Structures are given as structure tokens and as C-alpha cells.
Amino acid sequence: MGKIIGIDLGTTNSCVAIMDGTQARVLENAEGDRTTPSIIAYTQDGETLVGQPAKRQAVTNPQNTLFAIKRLIGRRFQDEEVQRDVSIMPYKIIGADNGDAWLDVKGQKMAPPQISAEVLKKMKKTAEDYLGEPVTEAVITVPAYFNDAQRQATKDAGRIAGLEVKRIINEPTAAALAYGLDKEVGNRTIAVYDLGGGTFDISIIEIDEVDGEKTFEVLATNGDTHLGGEDFDTRLINYLVDEFKKDQGIDLRNDPLAMQRLKEAAEKAKIELSSAQQTDVNLPYITADATGPKHMNIKVTRAKLESLVEDLVNRSIEPLKVALQDAGLSVSDINDVILVGGQTRMPMVQKKVAEFFGKEPRKDVNPDEAVAIGAAVQGGVLTGDVKDVLLLDVTPLSLGIETMGGVMTPLITKNTTIPTKHSQVFSTAEDNQSAVTIHVLQGERKRASDNKSLGQFNLDGINPAPRGMPQIEVTFDIDADGILHVSAKDKNSGKEQKITIKASSGLNEEEIQKMVRDAEANAESDRKFEELVQTRNQGDHLLHSTRKQVEEAGDKLPADDKTAIESALNALETALKGEDKAAIEAKMQELAQVSQKLMEIAQQQHAQQQAGSADASANNAKDDDVVDAEFEEVKDKK
């Protein structure tokens, strides 16, 4: 069995880790970094860039440089959070035919899982380069508060990237695994506060150790899937834009190029203000008007940034209270607080968390790498490489069906340990009703329409009977990935219907297969391009070395041979400008054939040079045989 890699597919950055023996190891990508920006760019010449190369060219290509795609994955276009992003993102978010949020890239409609798959492919390649063997299986992490549609969409992204997703696990749970695995922690209750680039989670986790076996049991989880570092950046960007407008009278919001530069500068300033009290946002030539170029130079203090984002930090406190309440614990029951996600480096976040829990958070967990390490550990558990670890996760939201009067009736309540299965018997609302519609919902609201609709299906063929008589058994079954399977059975007729919830939207099997094929075709064209470049380099080298040999041969090369070689060189030079690998190889072969006489001359010259240098060495050696004699002056005795 091959390695199961662990991938933290983040909103801002992604990370990949593997189990190396009993230790988890975070892998460096091709650029030498341990984390990869979750940025994908589609260039004008058809190239797809991922990570740092995509980030570097964002300023000149803002409309086709996609970031924070995780905020859109598994979401509907009409969702309030998506509509907020539509107005602030430089790229184009559109509604797909099925109502999902998709993207328009250079006139082509693309689904978020298809774009996230590019990041996963880079993670896969990073692991393959390190291991020297193909990787086909992965554990991928998601925010604990992701709903069913978002989890399913993440699995789809894995499939498009050529990975069999063996398990989807929650990010805070993964961080707890990373924290608890190599420590003699004994029995402890920990709080994992995970504030990443686009999502926020809090999980209360109990680690029990009995006879060397550790059980990680999630007691409760809560969060906000649209709160993260990107929102902090946006607050600072808006402040800078407003200040510039006050000063210069120009609104930069209409200039995508300026906004992209501003985004980079705001992110940099935010990071600097975690260690410094103030920083300068200095952007020369940010824009221009009739009077000439304009420059931005605005001082930002840590206090100013904190005042801009205070409500965002406070928004993360309410879920902490709910999670503790759901776990049946008080603040004093928490032994350790672990911070995960880059945004937790902000001093104000650390201070608020410390105030809430009444203790300083742990500093020995790397907030950028802990989640990927935990995913790799879970991969090790699945392959059997990691023993004595049991992970008990929970479903973050209640699951149920719509019943008479538009009410949500839960079958599985939130924070139920998964995998789990629950059945309940329902009946008809009308006399002689021959079919029922099972409308599956996820959420905590009493009114069905206020919850997330995950899908619906019909059970027909019910025998005619007075209302309330037929017995329809509805079964909810959640697997270890937190994905829901629903069945409904008429106990009288024995008729049954089953579905795996893929949300009322989501990608269908045909779309996923097409995207998998496209990804494979791209991989093939990438391989061909790489081979073409290698052949070009070989041809280029042959061209230069042959020209040099012709020069050195001088008059010793017969005129006929020289003409034939010149002609072959020109033919190769022309072929190198084209895209045909076979043509380049053929011209290289032709040049090699007509250059035989030249090769002989070159070899003779080389032999003569060697003989000459051997003679010179021999002469030097003779000179070396002369010994400097020592002598002393003898004075005559008088």
C-alpha cells in the first residue's frame, strides 16, 4: 500500500505532509517553501500557474488570478456571503445553471472544485517528487463547520486532481492530532481556536490515554465559514482606499491593477503590524490623472488596524461560548488552548482568546503546519503505520427533514459522534397519499426554509390509506467523512428509495469525470511541453557546440563538408523556433550525420592538445628533478 498524504487545503495557503516512520514531515514545494499560496492564475498564453508563481504575476493579471476559492466551494450563488464577495473580488463570480457559485475565467465557466484541484495537484506533485513514486490517496482537511455540500465539493476537487480521498477530517481535529500525538499529555481537554484565511472554527476536544492508546474525542464544534484573514485584509484595504480618496479625490476601486497592488500591500502591512507598532503603506505610481502620477504613502498603526477589525475578532467569541455550552463544560475545564491558522499571529486575537479562556494559548504548535501534520497522522492511522490512535469526530450541524407545516424535524443533532445512523418513522399528511417528498435539511433553525437545503427525493408507490396510517421509515447514515446517505422505506409495501446527499446543486458524476479527463489531458500536454523544452535545449546546445567546432577546424574542414554543415545548422535553427519535437530531433540527426568529418578533425585537435600538454608536463617534471643544494661558506683558518 502506498503512502496516504495529508493535505491542508487552505483559503490562503495550503500545506502537504507525510508520515516518515513514526514522525510526520511537512514537505517543501518546488520553490523551497513549506506552504503554498492557494492562488491559481490562467495566463494569456494558456499556461496555468499555481502558488508563488501565480501570486507574483497577480498585479498584471488580476481578473484571471483566483484566490480564496475555498470561500465559494459548495456554495450557492445567491448566498449572502457569496454576494458580498462578488462585489469585492477582482475576478468574476457567476451563477451556474444549477445555482452554484462558479467563476468566469477568460469566458470559460469553471467550478470551484475544478480550480481547487489545481492546488491539490501541486500538493500531490510535491509529495511525489519527495517520495519518488506516484501518490494516489490523500486525507484532506476542511473547516469543522463546513456543511455537507462543502465537504462533498472538497472530495470532488480531490478526484479531479487524481486523488482518492480516503478521509475528510476537520481542521481543528487534525491540529489536535498534531499536538497530542507526540506528547505525554495524559487525559486533557483542549480548545482548538482555528482562524485561517477564510474560515473560523472552534473545537473542544478530549484526549484520553489508556494503556498507551490515545483517543481524540471531539465534544463540540462551532464556527463561521466566512470569517478569516481575507476579511481582515478587506477592512484595511477599504481604509486605505478611503484615505487615498480623501487625500487625492480618486477612487481606486475602479482600477483592478491598483486594487491588486493594494491587496498585496495591505496583507504585508497586516503581517508587519503583528510585530511592529506602525508601518508605512508606500505605493509609488499607484494611479494617475490629468495632473500626473499619484503616489500612496499612508502610515498605519497597530491601534488603527485593531480598531478596524475589532468587531471581526469579537465575532469569533460567540462561537466559543456556544461550543463550551454544547460540550457541557466551563472555561476552567480547559487544560490547553491551541491556536491554528495564520491570522492567530495577530496580538489582538491572542489577547482576546487569552482573556476568554483565562490562560495563555500554547506557542509550541506551528499554526501554518499543524493541520497538514494531523492529516498525515490520520493517513498513517488508515494505512496502519500509526497505531494506538482513535479519532472520534462529530457532525457540526443538525440534520433532519421537513415535516408538516414547514417544520425542520432533526434526526441527528449537532455534535453527534460520527459515523452514525439514525432512523425515525413518519407518516402521510393526506388521505390516500401515494407519494411523499423527503426534503433533507441541515441547520439549527425550527423553520425548514431557514436551514440549508441538502436535497430532496420522492418515495412513491405508497398503498392508499387514511392519513397517518402508512409507516415511512427515514434513515440518516453519516459516514466518517461527515457525508450523509439518506433512505426512505414504506414499511407496508417494502418500497425503498436511497440517495447520497450531493446537495441540491453540486457537480454531477458526468461533470466530475469530464474535469478528471481535462486534468489528465492537461497533465499530458504539460508532459509534452516539458519534453519539447528538453529537446529544444539539446538542439540549442548542439547548434552552439557545432558552430564553435567549425570555427576551430578552420581550413582543415573541406569546403563541401562546411557547406553541408552550414545548411544543416540553418535547418536546425529554423526547427528550434517551431513546436514540433520530432522535427527538431530529425534536424539534430541530420546535423550529426553531415558532421562526421568535423568530429574527426575535432578529435584530432583534441588529441594534439592533450599530447602538447603532456609534453609540457614532462618538461616541467625534468625541471623539477633539479635539486637545490644546500651549502655553507667555509672560512680559511688564518
From Swiss-Prot:
Single GO MF descriptor: ATP-dependent protein folding chaperone
Biased composition range(s): Low complexity: 603-620
Top-level division of the source organism's lineage: Bacteria
InterPro entries: ATPase_NBD (IPR043129), Chaperone_DnaK (IPR012725), Heat_shock_70_CS (IPR018181), HSP70_C_sf (IPR029048), HSP70_peptide-bd_sf (IPR029047), Hsp_70_fam (IPR013126)
Annotated stretches, region: Disordered: 603-638
Keyword ATP-binding: yes
Residue(s) carrying Phosphothreonine: T199
Regulation: UMPylation of the chaperone by YdiU negatively regulates its activity, facilitating Salmonella survival under ATP-limited conditions.
Inducing stimuli: By stress conditions e.g. heat shock.
Record has Membrane as a keyword: no
PROSITE patterns found in the cross-reference section: HSP70_1 (PS00297), HSP70_2 (PS00329), HSP70_3 (PS01036)
Alphabetical list of Gene3D superfamilies matching this protein: 1.20.1270.10, 3.30.420.40, Actin, Chain A, domain 4, Substrate Binding Domain Of DNAk, Chain A, domain 1
Biological-process GO terms, alphabetical: chaperone cofactor-dependent protein refolding; DNA replication; protein refolding
Keywords per UniProt: ATP-binding, Chaperone, DNA replication, Nucleotide-binding, Phosphoprotein, Stress response
Entry GO terms, CC: cytosol
Stored PANTHER family: HEAT SHOCK PROTEIN 70KDA
NCBIfam families: PRK00290.1, PRK05183.1, prok_dnaK
Function, in words: Acts as a chaperone.
The family this protein is said to belong to: Belongs to the heat shock protein 70 family.
Name of the molecule in the record: Chaperone protein DnaK
Gene name for this UniProt entry: dnaK
